[in-house]
UniProtKB/Swiss-Prot annotation:
This is Lipid-A-disaccharide synthase. GO terms for molecular function: lipid-A-disaccharide synthase activity; phospholipid binding. NCBIfam families: lpxB. The keyword Lipid metabolism applies. The gene is lpxB. GO terms for biological process: lipid A biosynthetic process. Condensation of UDP-2,3-diacylglucosamine and 2,3-diacylglucosamine-1-phosphate to form lipid A disaccharide, a precursor of lipid A, a phosphorylated glycolipid that anchors the lipopolysaccharide to the outer membrane of the cell. One of its GO terms (cellular component) is membrane. Belongs to the LpxB family. It catalyses: a lipid X + a UDP-2-N,3-O-bis[(3R)-3-hydroxyacyl]-alpha-D-glucosamine = a lipid A disaccharide + UDP + H(+). Its EC number is 2.4.1.182. Pathway: Bacterial outer membrane biogenesis; LPS lipid A biosynthesis. Keywords: Glycosyltransferase, Lipid A biosynthesis, Lipid biosynthesis, Lipid metabolism, Transferase. Pfam families: LpxB (PF02684).
Length: 383
């Protein structure tokens, strides 16, 4: 369905980390297709900017995770929050599309609500895991909550939040090919043992995860001299950010690939993947993996008190059980990482059981078409 263009069709979009940037960019493409002439301003990464977003601030300035990591950035984050509030008051966008990043976006939503600007929130905060009281705040400041996990719409029943499961954006992706086909596409030797390492899209994640991943790679190379290691560089990062870590492992063969996380994982015999959206992105490639994560001691202590779920990896949450190993904090050591990857490389039954469970997770994500459904929701609330 096409909507008639209007001279003043402008919306506000805010997306922080790499996955949100991708989801928002695809939605913006659909919005522009449905309503030619529509423009957008706000905060986003490279994909949103390529799609036409007028970026008032870079995504990395607001995409910070963990209490200790956020504290030194608070002045800059609050400055961007105030700047977006002023921009919204001056430009009066027809609607706002806020993607993930709840600590920032819910505060912005409250400001937008006072201005009478309809708010569509895409990618629900994980209130089913912690801080469930936020449902009341969401009901006050969000007009439509668009959920990407199948159980989230039911969670909001009776809370006053207008929620809809729109399907997961990753459901758009075709079934994965063979490891050999991805290695060929990436220019990697097809016959060599290939291990993917996905350290994340934030500098703080690189700092905590890439060094132990590289040390684990050294151990794995000792057992597999032919092994090659591949690291996708998130769109929100520059290759130069990885160089200091790689410099300590000059004899280790590490191939950097700009973006293309799914292809890197698809090319692997096994993968080390940081917890978060990356685990689902990797899981959809149906490759055996180990999930790792580290926070500052303060952030982890707070999380342990607040989080109410048994698993942290998204694929485990969706499966309702531990289908992939989770190595957190001290357990995310080079020794444990190497041992778990070695088990997946050598134990055929463990590999096949994990892949079978990942197939079930993939099937639970709903039908393709999430960007279109989100675009229609935004157009539906536009003033």
């Amino acid at each position: 369905m096409l909507y008639s263009p209007r001279l003043t069709d402008q919306i506000l979009i805010v997306a922080g980390e790499a996955s949100a940037d991708l989801h928002a960019a695809r939605t913006l493409h659909e919005l522009q297709r449905l309503r030619p002439g529509l423009t957008a301003f706000g905060v986003g990464g490279p994909r949103l900017r390529e799609a036409g977003l007028e970026a008032l601030a870079p995504a990395e300035d607001i995409s910070v995770m963990g209490l200790a990591e956020v504290l030194p950035r608070i002045p800059r984050i609050l400055g961007i929050l105030r700047m977006l509030g002023r921009a919204a008051a001056e430009r009066r966008p027809k609607a706002a599309l806020l993607v993930d990043l709840p600590d920032f976006n819910l505060r912005l939503a409250a400001r937008l609500k006072k201005l009478g600007i309809p708010v569509v929130y895409y990618v629900s905060p994980t209130i089913w895991a912690w801080r469930q009281g936020r449902a009341k705040q969401i009901a006050r400041v969000v007009d439509r909550m668009l959920c990407i996990l199948p159980f989230e719409e039911r969670f909001y029943e009776g809370t006053g939040v207008s929620a809809r499961f729109v399907g997961h954006p990753f459901a758009e992706r075709p079934p994965p090919g063979t490891p050999e086909s991805y290695r060929s596409a990436l220019g990697l030797p097809a016959a060599r043992t290939t291990i993917a390492m996905v350290p994340g899209s934030r500098p703080s994640e690189l700092k905590r995860l890439l060094p132990p991943m590289l040390e684990a790679a050294e151990r794995l190379r000792a057992a597999h001299p032919d092994a090659q290691f591949v690291v996708p560089v998130a769109p929100t990062l520059d290759r130069a950010a990885l160089e200091p870590y790689l410099a300590a492992h000059r004899t280790l063969e590490v191939r950097l690939v700009d973006g293309r996380t799914e292809e890197v994982v698809g090319a692997s015999d096994a993968a080390l993947v940081k917890s978060g959206t990356s685990t689902l992105e990797a899981g959809l490639m149906l490759r055996p993996m180990v999930v790792v994560y580290k926070l500052s001691w303060l952030s982890y202590a707070v999380a342990r008190m607040l989080v109410k779920i048994a698993h942290v990896a998204l694929v485990n949450i969706l499966a309702g059980r531990g289908i992939v190993p989770e190595l957190l904090q001290r357990d995310a050591s080079p020794e444990r990482m190497a041992a778990e990857v070695e088990r997946l490389l050598g134990d055929r039954a463990a590999r096949e059981a994990q892949i079978a469970a990942l197939r079930e997770v993939r099937a639970s994500l709903g039908e393709p078409g999430a960007p279109l459904r989100v675009a229609e929701e935004v157009l539906g609330v536009m003033r």
